[in-house]
Design a protein with these regions (language model features):
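AMP-binding/adenylate-forming catalytic core of the ANL superfamily
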Residues: 265, 273, 284, 417, ...
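Conserved AMP-binding/adenylate-forming core of the ANL superfamily
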Residues: 37-89, 109-116, 171, 192-201
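Conserved AMP-binding/adenylate-forming
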Residues: 303-305, 312-452, 460-462
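Conserved AMP-binding/adenylation subdomain of ANL enzymes
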Residues: 201-218, 228-271, 286-292
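Conserved C-terminal "lid"/linker of ANL adenylate-forming enzymes
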Residues: 489, 493-494, 505-506, 526-576
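Structural core segment of the AMP-binding/adenylate-forming
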Residues: 96-163, 170, 276-277, 282, ...
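N-lobe entry segment of adenylate-forming
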Residues: 1-50, 54-69, 73, 97, ...
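Conserved pre-ATP/AMP-binding loop-to-beta segment of ANL
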Residues: 35, 153, 163-182, 188-189, ...
Length: 576
């Protein structure tokens, strides 16, 4: 059996940094070269090399099938986004047909059949697609979701077997909407972010320049295509900037996370690979105290280790560095960033090669509380530098009344630039609430220092007790300092007591069935949180795998709060 050859890193085709009018133009150009995508199985073995030339051929055929099926320019094409060549071809097929591809999440292990159908259903209601296309492996679930909304639904194989006769393709303009992107938290009231070709390609060029992409770079990714970092950063960007990419399915990464590092090791050139903090944490935990790190891995050519999509945890990144430094990993490769789907993707990037920088900020500066008189010890929090704005992007930190705040003052992060979304699809009210005079309210809290952005947390997650601001991450971090607890095991949020007072509640996933041990843990958690944060919190121990997550794997504090208050999360009884 002949060994499959991956698409090359080097190519004679001159690189263009996303300077195209439309996404279709970008693929037309990339297809003239030899680079492309490479899909790997759970063990990291190459299963399919997919040059951009083949992707374009398949996408044009998919476009013709869509047009024959009655799809018109502006129609929405819902795509369940698995990491497969078929998804890539269908996404670009929709683009060539003038339709709007709408990536939707795969089922996860959280929740059951009805939960998934409900989640997909509300997103289908929101985007009102003309067709739903899905991997054949989930035909029962996806078909039921389509049937519940009377939407024509086809498996990829079934649709791919239909005729694709020659038919004229529409001409796109740079101001047209290219696709809709649902943010990872948009389940109950989803907002489809409408991104134009112009905004997309400007952002793709901006972050390619910011990362100093060069001829020896190759991307390695396990990120899902239904999340903005995976879709925009590791799929569309690689086409528009002509970068060969090695893909590992998200589910395969979850089962065998070190396969990600195996792929980076095997890349003879320089690697650019991105992950939220939890990806680095899983790898550091999995390698544990193994002594063969340097024998299995060579991470010395990992040029950019991007981090974003969630709060960046410096303690986790340090553990990853300690675990993999023997394999040649250089902490200067870390590339902290900040972005959101409403800004296409990238808003800020740390300059390449500067690594991760952290500021220790006193609690009163984050909470807005008056400085202490020295009667209690100061408490500090490590805040990660998320870099400088990408080109043509402006940032302001604003108070609640809209006033622009000085440097090193925490407030709401607002941004303006050519990559800001057109709006939320079909929801003018929500659009008007966050887009004001061309400025986007990101919903995040942070501050500026010497032109660099520091993110403190989500405004909606803030816990306000007696007029003082508290960040749930600080409370959760306190619990994580105890043995046996990790990020994702804890959710902190505000509740109202029977007496009408606001107080923090802390849900902690507990793996022991011994009631005496639970009581010991309950007391230990309560005392640890009090010692670190100074707060008395309602501590609730809950069963494992209870805390809800978004489709991209992030903890959903808002959903956890709703489930707790509705009684759907039942804590263990602890005899305090």
């Amino acid at each position: 059996m002949t060994e499959m050859t991956p698409t090359p890193t080097l190519d004679e085709l001159p690189r263009r940094f996303s300077d195209f009018d439309t996404l279709g133009d970008a693929l037309d150009y990339a297809a003239q070269g030899k680079r492309g995508f490479n899909f790997h199985d759970a063990r990291g073995t190459l299963a399919r090399a997919y040059p951009f030339r083949e992707l374009r051929e398949d996408a044009l055929a998919a476009a013709r099938r869509l047009i024959v099926a009655g799809i018109k320019p502006g129609d929405r094409v819902a795509l369940i986004a698995d990491t497969e060549p078929q998804f890539c071809a269908l996404f670009f097929g929709a683009v060539y047909a003038g339709a709007l591809p709408v990536p939707l999440p795969l089922p996860t292990s959280f929740g059951g059949r009805e939960s998934y159908i409900d989640q997909i259903g509300v997103q289908l209601d929101s985007c009102d697609p003309a067709i739903l296309l899905f991997p054949d492996e989930i035909a029962e679930l996806a078909g039921a979701a389509g049937q519940s909304r009377a939407i024509a639904a086809y498996g990829w194989d079934d649709f791919g077997g239909q005729d694709a006769p020659d038919t004229p393709l529409p001409t796109a303009n740079s101001g047209d909407i290219a696709y809709l992107q649902y943010s990872s938290g948009s389940t109950r009231f989803p907002h489809g972010v409408a991104v134009s070709h112009r905004a997309l390609l400007h952002n793709l060029g901006s972050h390619a320049h910011g990362m100093l992409i060069n001829d020896t770079d190759r991307c390695i990714s396990w990120l899902p295509f239904y999340h903005d970092m995976g879709l925009v950063g590791c799929f569309l960007s690689m086409v528009a900037n002509q970068v060969s990419t090695d893909f590992l399915k998200t589910a395969d990464f979850a089962r065998r996370p070190l396969s990600w590092l195996d792929l980076i090791t095997r890349n003879p050139g320089t690697s650019c690979s991105f992950s939220p903090t939890f990806g680095y944490e899983i790898c550091a935990r999995r390698i544990g105290s193994q002594s063969n790190v340097q024998e299995r891995f060579d991470l010395s050519r990992w040029r950019l280790a991007g981090n974003g999509a969630d709060m960046i945890r410096p303690d986790v990144m340090q553990r990853f560095t300690d675990a993999f430094a023997p394999a040649g990993f250089d902490a200067k490769a870390f590339l902290p960033s900040y972005g959101l789907a409403e800004a296409t993707l990238a808003v800020t990037l740390m300059p390449s090669g500067e690594g991760m920088e952290v500021e220790l900020v006193e609690e009163t500066e984050l909470s807005g509380e008056k400085r202490s008189d020295g009667s209690r010890p100061k408490r500090f929090r490590a805040i990660v530098n998320c870099g400088k704005p990408v080109r043509d992007t402006l940032l302001e930190i604003r108070a609640e009344n809209g006033a622009v705040l000085a440097e090193k003052t925490v407030g709401k992060v607002w941004m303006k630039g050519p990559a800001v979304m057109e709006g939320y699809y079909g929801d003018q009210e929500a659009t008007d609430a966050c887009l004001v005079d061309g400025w986007l309210d990101t919903g995040d809290m942070g501050y500026l220092s010497n032109g660099y952005l520091y993110i403190v947390g989500r405004a909606k997650d803030m816990i306000i007790i007696n007029g003082k601001n508290h960040w749930p991450q600080d409370i959760e971090w306190a619990v994580e300092q105890l043995p046996g607890f990790k990020a994702g095991d804890i959710a902190a949020f505000a509740i109202t007591t029977p007496g009408g007072e606001e107080t923090p509640a802390v849900l902690v996933q507990c793996r022991t069935s011994d009631e005496i041990e639970r009581l010991r843990l309950w007391n230990e958690i309560r005392e640890k949180v009090r010692a670190i944060t100074g707060m008395n919190c309602v501590i609730e121990l809950v069963p494992p795998r209870t805390l809800p997550r978004t489709s991209s794997g992030k903890l959903s504090r808002a959903k956890a709060r709703n489930l707790y208050l509705s009684g759907d999360i039942q804590p263990y009884a602890v005899a305090a």
